[in-house]
């Protein structure tokens, strides 16, 4: 039997997934069923684009529900405050300066299930996070990214 993939995440990340799951099950599912019902009333389903679109959306919603249920079932909750031992760990917020230009960037390292670069949350599987994990404040680190090597100095690590 294959082992299930573990999804490391913060309590906040798990709560967001639970909220999304609740929304999908109680609101989106009903909306899609209603769209299918309306589209069926148009008659011939063989050339009914509204029906096809609603069925596609239903498949997406059901797939997302299954994915989220799996993530929640296999969640490994990370307590950043507990794990923070002076080293960059999952759940930490890290501020670093790109060398040599001095551009400052701040990211929170989270599990892939809750990553959102637009909110400054990067996956622990991303090249930047992989390069920062296990290092401490004041360290200069070379991070290998698809665009090439990037040198940074870790300025601050905080538990999120």
UniProtKB/Swiss-Prot annotation:
Family to which the UniProt record says this protein belongs: Belongs to the GreA/GreB family.
NCBIfam families the UniProt entry points to: greA (TIGR01462), PRK00226.1-2 (NF001261), PRK00226.1-4 (NF001263)
Coiled-coil annotated spans: 10-37
GO molecular function annotations of the record: DNA binding; RNA polymerase binding
Keywords: Coiled coil, DNA-binding, Transcription, Transcription regulation
Purpose: Necessary for efficient RNA polymerase transcription elongation past template-encoded arresting sites. The arresting sites in DNA have the property of trapping a certain fraction of elongating RNA polymerases that pass through, resulting in locked ternary complexes. Cleavage of the nascent transcript by cleavage factors such as GreA or GreB allows the resumption of elongation from the new 3'terminus. GreA releases sequences of 2 to 3 nucleotides.
Pfam families: GreA_GreB, GreA_GreB_N
Family annotation (SUPFAM superfamilies): FKBP-like, GreA transcript cleavage protein, N-terminal domain
Descriptive protein name: Transcription elongation factor GreA
Source species of the chain: Listeria monocytogenes serovar 1/2a (strain ATCC BAA-679 / EGD-e)
UniProt record, GO biological process: DNA-templated transcription elongation; regulation of DNA-templated transcription elongation
Record InterPro entries: GreA/GreB_C_sf, TF_GreA/GreB_CS, Tscrpt_elong_fac_GreA, Tscrpt_elong_fac_GreA/B, Tscrpt_elong_fac_GreA/B_C, Tscrpt_elong_fac_GreA/B_fam, Tscrpt_elong_fac_GreA/B_N, Tscrpt_elong_fac_GreA/B_N_sf
């Amino acid at each position: 039997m294959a082992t299930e993939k573990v999804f490391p995440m913060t309590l906040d990340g798990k709560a967001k997934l639970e909220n999304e799951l609740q929304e999908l099950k109680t609101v989106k599912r009903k909306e899609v069923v209603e769209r299918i019902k309306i589209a069926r009333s148009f008659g011939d389903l063989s050339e009914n684009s509204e029906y096809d679109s609603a069925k596609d959306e239903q498949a997406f919603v059901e797939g997302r529900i299954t994915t989220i249920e799996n993530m929640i079932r296999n969640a490994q909750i990370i307590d950043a405050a507990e794990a923070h031992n002076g080293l960059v760990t999952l759940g930490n917020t890290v501020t670093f300066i790109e060398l040599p230009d001095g551009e400052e960037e701040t990211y929170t390292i989270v599990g892939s299930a809750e990553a959102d670069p637009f909110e400054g949350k990067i996956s622990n599987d991303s090249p930047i996070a992989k390069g920062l994990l296990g290092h401490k404040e004041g360290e200069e680190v070379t991070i290998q990214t698809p665009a090439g090597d990037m040198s940074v100095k870790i300025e601050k690590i905080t538990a999120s």
